[in-house]
Amino acid sequence: MESKDHNGLRSKVEFIIEFEEGKLFRDLIDAIKQINDRGWFKFNKSGFGYSQYSEENKIWIDITINGSGLKYEFKCNDPDYAVELEIKSIKNNLSQVSAKDGIKIYKLLNEQNIYFQRTSKLVNVSKSVCCMAIPNVVKEHQEYNPPEYAEGEDKPTITVGSIEFKKELSSIIKTGSQINEIHITKNSVTFAGANQEKTSTAVAQFDANPGIKISGLERYSPVISKKEFNISIEVSKKVLKYFSKISTLTKSNGIKLFVQENLPLKIVSNFGTHGTIKSYIDIGQN
């Protein structure tokens, strides 16, 4: 790690991004690093995207951010720019960013380093410039193409308030659960946690009504019929923590869960007012 003072910055950058809401970006990094320490950022003139697949947790994260409103500026000869970064290192560099700070992210021409600069709105607060080496720069990487969901009643959509979503998942995490599962039926998604002895259990059920009810794990029994389906997948506590943290980014827009038989569980949330965060959990039918 080193500090530098880049005078005349804009005349020699390959790309630059400015965030007025630095804490929002910090919270985004904090969420996605729960799943994996590495992922792909793609930058272009209209905004930026991020994608990450965790083989261990069987979850894909796909983020699309509109650059408008972010003081976003892109400068590069290539129409797209892809960089593999260590998310854990980014998080460490952003730990001091507060709600009143902004962030600049940029890369200088002919350098293999990316820089994160804290830009504070407070008087007499120094601006820190942190240098982090990029493991590698790539032009291409494999995209994830999730299957399309059918229209109509075969595509149940469950909308949950972000505050309720965070509250109920947090209750499961706090049980110290060692067994975590997601149960899916045509009209509901249930997150459940229990310890090995099942002496401590917690369940958060989100219905298509919509609605929420908490009960003991042993009392949850999905109805199975020709018109219903029952899918169950074990997930790690990292996955639960990830969803708990992204709920803080949605503000008043809520979280949407898309449920369809034989397809990944699709969970859509927002990055403030600037873009969407799509998460796909690979599921196996019982």
Regions found by a protein language model. Name each.
Residues 1-33, 38-175, 181-286:
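DNA polymerase sliding clamps and clamp-related checkpoint/processivity subunits
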